[in-house]
Amino acid sequence: MLYDSYEKEHSKRGFLELMEKGTVVAPCVYDCVSAKMVEQAGFPAMCLSGGELAASLVGVPDIGLVTLDELVGVVERISSCTSIPMIVDIDTGFGNELNLIRTCKRIAQAGAKAVHLEDQTFPKRCGHLQGKTVIGHDEYISKIRAAKYALEGSGCALIARTDAYHVISKEEAISRCNDAIDAGADITFIEGNATIEDIIDCGKRVKGPKMFAMLSSGASPKVTAEQVSGWGYRLVTMHYAMFAALAAMEEFGKKCFESGSDIPITDDPKVDGRPIYLFEKFGIHEWLRLGNSFGGNIKDADELEKRE
């Protein structure tokens, strides 16, 4: 589907609807290319990662340095070129309850089908880093109520994330999640469950739909979506796109630097380095046909023939 398709945007299914049919796996993305590749891999949903966005868009670590305007712009661009629903990490909501209301409305209007709001103090940091602090229990629930108010009627679900597991205790994390559900959250998310026993226990004791963030290279144990589904989690995120891209860029960057050529790329059977390969992922032929449908005379974009 082409850019800014209203029909496409309205036809995107919500997360609660998807979760009724089974556990939804939503890999993390950070730009239009990663989002398109997740969609074309066959996943039913995606999650815009705050940490990966900070690195790719601004070139900074995940310590609360991305602005709301920067985030909204990326949400708009990804929404315009994909057809699967997206969760958006809104960190701490960019302020108090009033700031949060504006944040939620702007992100929902930009095309998000879910947001996840955390209870860290500002400036926040990646949930898998030490040195986190969280706001008070009552303040967090107040922000959940404000976010729910802002999202009412938008079709955008509210995911209540807590970092209290590592900062305070598992019991406090469970309590915050249950109170968040009572305050209107649609889904809950305990960041960084460190053991399988705790993942199972939280799955049993937290009310309502639950999300699990799969990051086995971080604080969480190695598990599969099938496993956590059996433990009561209906939404699972994973971080493969950026880490795979980083590894490939490091590998081929070294080879190309040492050879002084792009031959390591062009001769690798796993890599299609043709420009048309990239552009076809984003609908170049459909774009050109669209231009001609209005009476234009735009030539199609076939590849140049290679001369030996």
Residue ranges of each PLM-predicted region?
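Flexible C-terminal active-site loop/helix
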Residues: 259-308
